């Protein structure tokens, strides 16, 4: 997909077109790609906040139900991450409901525009101890065992066929628990399953977790979901703590896997000699955002 086409795609979206289906058809593709998902969600930016403002009841019920999962686990949690944070409509309304509010709150999304909306939404909710950035679910710019509790809310959803890949990457960064709120294909009706297959939604998340030997401590239909044709399944995975590392700087370069440091308002890896920009407050930490800057830390004033 060429970036020159974005304005055409935006016009199709404005007229009510299904962007994911359009992009798949135009590329003769069976499954969703990262680029298709990014374009689709970037175009939708702002809609989730608008929906929650107009329909606060569902969000309140959903985040309350999610908070009960965290509170039931009851561990001391220093850090939390929402993968696929979107516009932070879940994260921002979940945090105040937690009995133990983490010191560090993280969230990332593939789409820059969604993260930009999320930043403002978190500010309006007066939740300020957050770090939101762009990132890739399959190449997360975070170190191993760096986040106490990692959770998703229909974020793995459009990645059918990549369930194992997603689980392995999520477990890599998880220190204690991974909480997955994703399409419950195994709990869905025949009609709902057919719809999930049409949209390219995941359907083998639980079986993938079992085949990988992960410690699934809970798996059931979640109490709250907005669409009966896309029921939410809950899966909680506990990570064996014996090999966990203590991580002080969780951010890593998605290419070299070396630590990132905030230098001159950008994130730089001294070992990898790559720099990642911060655009309007949003750190851009996708592989494609990397800029080669072998002399980034030079003292240019001495020229």
Predicted region positions:
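N-terminal auxiliary segments of SAM/dcSAM-dependent transferases
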Residues: 1-34, 249-303
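Class I SAM-dependent methyltransferase Rossmann-like catalytic core
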Residues: 43-61
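Conserved alpha-helix/loop element of class I SAM-dependent methyltransferases that forms part
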Residues: 57-76
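Class I SAM-dependent methyltransferase SAM/SAH-binding core
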Residues: 87-138
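A conserved beta-strand element that flanks and buttresses the S-adenosyl-L-methionine
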Residues: 151
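A short, conserved alpha-helix within the catalytic core of class I
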Residues: 158-169
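Conserved beta-strand signature within the Rossmann-like core of class I S-adenosyl-L-methionine
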Residues: 175-185
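Short alpha-helix
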Residues: 196-215
């Amino acid at each position: 997909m060429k970036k020159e086409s974005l304005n055409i795609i935006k016009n199709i979206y404005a007229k009510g077109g299904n962007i994911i289906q359009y992009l798949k058809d135009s590329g003769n593709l069976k499954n969703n790609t990262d680029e298709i998902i990014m374009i689709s969600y970037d175009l939708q930016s702002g809609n989730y906040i608008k929906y929650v403002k107009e329909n606060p009841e569902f969000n309140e019920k959903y985040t309350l139900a999610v908070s009960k999962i965290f509170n039931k686990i009851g561990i001391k949690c220093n850090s939390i991450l929402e993968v696929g944070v979107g516009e932070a409509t879940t994260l921002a309304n979940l945090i105040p409901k937690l009995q133990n509010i983490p010191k560090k709150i993280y969230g990332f999304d593939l789409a820059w525009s969604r993260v930009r909306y999320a930043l403002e939404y978190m500010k309006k909710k007066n939740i300020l101890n957050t770090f939101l950035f762009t990132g890739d679910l399959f190449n997360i710019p975070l170190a191993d065992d760096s986040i106490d509790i990692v959770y998703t809310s229909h974020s793995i959803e459009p990645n059918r066929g990549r369930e194992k890949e997603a689980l392995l990457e999520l477990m890599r960064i998880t220190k204690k628990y991974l909480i997955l709120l994703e399409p419950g294909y195994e709990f869905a009706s025949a009609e709902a399953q057919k719809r999930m297959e049409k949209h390219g939604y995941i359907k083998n998340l639980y079986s993938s977790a079992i085949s990988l030997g992960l410690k699934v401590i809970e798996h059931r239909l979640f109490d709250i979901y907005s669409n009966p044709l896309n029921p939410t399944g809950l899966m909680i995975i506990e990570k064996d703590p014996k090999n966990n590392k203590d991580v002080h700087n969780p951010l890593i370069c998605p290419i070299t896997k070396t630590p990132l440091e905030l230098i001159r308002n950008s994130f730089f890896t001294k070992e990898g000699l790559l720099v990642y920009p911060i655009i309007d407050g949003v750190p851009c930490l996708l592989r494609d955002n990397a800029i080669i800057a072998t002399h980034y830390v030079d003292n240019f004033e001495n020229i």
